[in-house]
Amino acid sequence: MELKVICMTARSATLETEAGRIFEFDTEGEIYINGSLYKRTNRVIFSLFGLKPDTEYEVCLKRDGEEARTVFRTGYEFVTLNVREVGAKGDGIQDDTGFIQAAILACPKNGRVLIPKGVYRITSLFLKSHIRLELAAGAVLAADTDRFRYPRFPGMIESCDETEDYNLGTWEGNPLPMFAGIINGIEVEDVVIYGEGLVDGQASFENWWNDVGTMRGAFRPRMVFLERCKSITLQGFHLKNSPTWVLHPYFSQGLRFLDLDIRNPADSPNTDGLDPESCRDVEIAGLHFSLGDDCIAIKSGKIYMGRRYKTPSENIEIRQCLMENGHGAVTVGSEVGAGVKAVQVKDCLFRCTDRGLRVKTRRGRGRDSVLSDISFQHIIMENVMTPFVVNSFYFCDPDGRTDYVQCREALPVDERTPEIKNLSFKDIKASDCHVAASFLCGLPEQKIRKIELENVEISFAEQAREGVPAMMEGVEACSRQGFTVMNVDTLICKNVTITGQKGDAFIMSNIDYFEQY
């Protein structure tokens, strides 16, 4: 057992235990800081708070007769601005937005804005570069539910010389008006938001989740919206009851999401957990998701944004996460007009999600929409409806059910045709599945270029529930169906086993090369 520091500030640290486990251990371990018991935890990745700046600490983890130690020194901090001293009350009655915003704007480089215990009623906060924002234990940022008290971001603004546009607002892959998020970063860098507190969107079916198909004023806000940002870290705190997507980094890079807890009701609409859109160099580690839509959805805009900015999402690592109750555990799409590449998912637990891996695309995403080099390794799935889904006929768009999108015949490859290649699934065990082992479907005119499965074990629940494996026209509900694979040029299966299925283990059509051993 080894212990390493993966993130450190002047007041906090996140550590990772290297012991070959996924997300958590069977037993709790004891964490000692400089010889004193700090807490007990069974988590592989955990955080420490309440540390002092520029101070050396020895951390010892004891579990089942084993010990692991590490020593580190916390970083520098210039000054702390306590929002109470700036005028915030934290009584849940006063609108504290302006007071917290004043503290953020007044905070110098390498300073800390401290939000102590209390309930702070707010609308939208805006970050600035080179600061640290701490949500202390017991601190709650309680978002106002009156949408018309939030600022509005226009979708696209024409430049003064009429030669360029400035994109600010976004909704599901298009430049559209949106309400500002609860916490916003616009072109900021070197920011850490950390602590043991809570951001509560206070969304419910009486406000933000009511009549979600109608835009009223603007589209719904995200909990945290980061646009064109660099070097941003979110560490340790809790988020719940989001109006829509919880974390939405947009055209940003150098992002770290560590040891966060994200919860929304299972029936809450469009409450994705973390949706990096046209982002690169993203680390997602130690997060717990339990929500009403995709846990993680990697995107890059619809065809207009893909053609205009040609900014794929790339170099994304997801590890040691627990994903529960969502539609998809890790989803790519469906807004992927600029493509997605180099995604690695490892050492994760998927529990009670509709799908494990979920790739959603369709004709019309464009030739820049290349989804490539996506790998899953050392994954456990429990009670997942369908472990692997690749759907090239996704119908959830205004034109998603048109003949062009849903035609099963090979159409000409043109500037509207997306591509999928190099998908890898290794060391995966999925138990108590329900609908199908997989549903992997490329386009007949642009087949998926290589799928490899190695050391994959799938078994079905005895009382398997029926469901539709993929959101495309003509797919009927089923249960305990085997590996369905269509329109793939190369399929390689090494040590792949399936038990409890009805009928054939593999149902394949239009496969150019199949190798099994």
Language-model features: where?
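Extracellular/periplasmic carbohydrate-active domains that bind, remodel
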Residues: 1-517
